[in-house]
Structure formats: C-alpha cells, structure tokens
C-alpha cells in the first residue's frame, strides 16, 4: 500500500479551522485517519503577500489509484473555497492549498502532477513535519 505525503497550507480566513477541516475531509476521502504534523507558519513562496501561511503535513496509507487521490484533493480544495491553482500562472493568496509531495516510490512528471514534488527536499527540512517520519 503506497504512502501518500501531502503538504497543506492556508493563508486566508480561519487558517487553523480550514486545515483541521481539510485533514478530516482527507481522512474520509482516503479511507485512512492518517498522521498529521503540528502546524507551523511560513512566508508565501513564489509571491508577495501580507498574509502568512499556516501549514501542516499529512501522511496516509492509501489503496486508491493516484488519479482518484489527486481528484479528491482538488475536490476538497474547492469545497473549502479554493477557486484556482494560480492566477495567470502566478500564485495568489488562498484559503487552502493541498500539494501531493510523494506517492510511495512513484516518479511522475505530467502536465498536472510532478512526483516527488519539486519542493519535497525543502519540505522535509521544515519543523514539525513528523508526519513524514516512518511509523
């Protein structure tokens, strides 16, 4: 069963509530309670904003096909107010962002998804990402 690593972030609205809701919805959608890291704050990456991000990481054991996982993550983003991944190719403030960081040992580079995520080495150095640690 592949291990799914996700990075979640929010820099608009009630960030902590949004992240908690996203994690609950992910557990339901993926069929696994998962392991969720502590939250931490960060500056936006790739754009300037006065709004800092609240972030966490999540680890799930999942039997769903990768395409279904990707679609369910996008659906949860939409449910929580996300309208687009970027605006004219530029990142913007958002109520929720769910990034797939890794799916087991899968290596993929498509128009919609790159695995492992290009920022995964950077993400692993973040404090509080104990969700990445082996069980």
Question: Where are the model-predicted features located?
Answer:
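Flexible, gly/pro- and Lys/Arg-enriched active-site loops
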Residues: 34, 45-53, 64-135
């Amino acid at each position: 069963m592949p291990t799914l690593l996700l990075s979640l972030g929010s820099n608009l609205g009630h960030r902590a509530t949004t992240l908690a809701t996203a994690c609950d919805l992910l557990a339901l959608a993926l069929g696994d309670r998962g392991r969720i890291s502590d939250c931490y704050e960060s500056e936006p990456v790739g754009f300037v904003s006065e709004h800092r991000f609240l972030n966490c990481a999540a680890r799930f054991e999942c039997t769903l096909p990768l395409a279904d996982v990707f679609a369910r993550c996008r659906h949860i983003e939409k449910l929580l107010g996300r309208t687009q991944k970027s605006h004219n190719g530029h990142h913007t403030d958002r109520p929720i962002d769910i990034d797939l960081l890794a799916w087991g040992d899968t290596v993929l580079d498509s128009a919609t998804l790159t695995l492992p995520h290009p920022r995964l080495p950077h993400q692993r150095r973040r404090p509080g990402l104990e969700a990445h640690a082996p069980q």
